[in-house]
């Protein structure tokens, strides 16, 4: 049986919010923000948002907790819709092997050139920092990993004891 790929329906007047997922993404880092952005279509007074996932494959991504997610787009092969907001959730290897993925880091750099906002949740800040897009702004990460963040990226303006930092188009939490 041949399966037909189902792409998400993207309303042209909405913001496009892409979630960068990889094996080991933590469920709540992805699903809770996805839900919040997706539900903007039910709110009055704010611009609605299209939500979709991007990964380096179209094969299922397995979260740290074992949930399998079919990515909407493969950023290594697909023509992607314009991405207004990139969300980088924390993943199991955000502080180590994911930082060696040059294709992913270059994807982040490329999206940063035109995105309205670049966001991370917890250790998702590490790939943003590795892409050098946080070099001139303040940022933060998961509280128990602040010292690792400071050690790995000593040139950054890192804030601790805060829930989030919003500096220009960059939002880290």
Where are the predicted features?
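Structural detector of well-ordered beta-strand residues that form the stable sheet scaffold
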Residues: 118-119, 140, 159, 171
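A conserved active-site-flanking secondary-structure segment within enzyme catalytic domains
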Residues: 135-161
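Short secondary-structure transition/capping segments
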Residues: 131-132, 171
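Residues that mark the start of a beta-strand
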Residues: 14-16, 138, 169
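Aromatic-residue-lined binding/catalytic grooves and analogous aromatic/hydrophobic interfacial grooves
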Residues: 122
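Extended, subdomain-level signal for the structured scaffold at the beginning of enzyme domains
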Residues: 1-118, 126-130, 158-160
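Short secondary-structure capping/turn micro-motifs that flank functional sites
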Residues: 127, 144-145, 166
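Conserved anion/nucleotide-ligand pocket segment
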Residues: 166-173
């Amino acid at each position: 049986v041949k399966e037909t790929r189902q792409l998400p329906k993207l309303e042209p007047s909405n913001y496009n919010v892409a979630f960068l997922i990889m094996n080991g993404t933590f469920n709540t880092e992805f699903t809770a923000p996805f839900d919040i952005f997706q539900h903007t279509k039910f709110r009055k007074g704010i611009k609605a948002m299209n939500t979709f996932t991007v990964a380096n494959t179209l094969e299922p991504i397995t979260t740290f907790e074992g949930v399998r997610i079919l990515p909407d787009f493969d950023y290594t092969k697909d023509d992607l819709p314009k991405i207004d907001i990139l969300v980088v959730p924390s993943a199991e290897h955000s502080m180590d092997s994911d930082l060696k993925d040059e294709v992913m880091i270059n994807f982040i750099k490329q999206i940063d050139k035109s995105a309205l906002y670049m966001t991370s949740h917890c250790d998702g800040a590490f790939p943003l920092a590795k892409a050098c897009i946080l070099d001139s702004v303040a940022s933060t990460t998961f509280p128990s990993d602040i010292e690792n963040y400071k050690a790995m990226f000593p040139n950054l303006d890192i804030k601790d004891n805060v829930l989030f930092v919003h500096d220009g188009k960059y939002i880290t939490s």
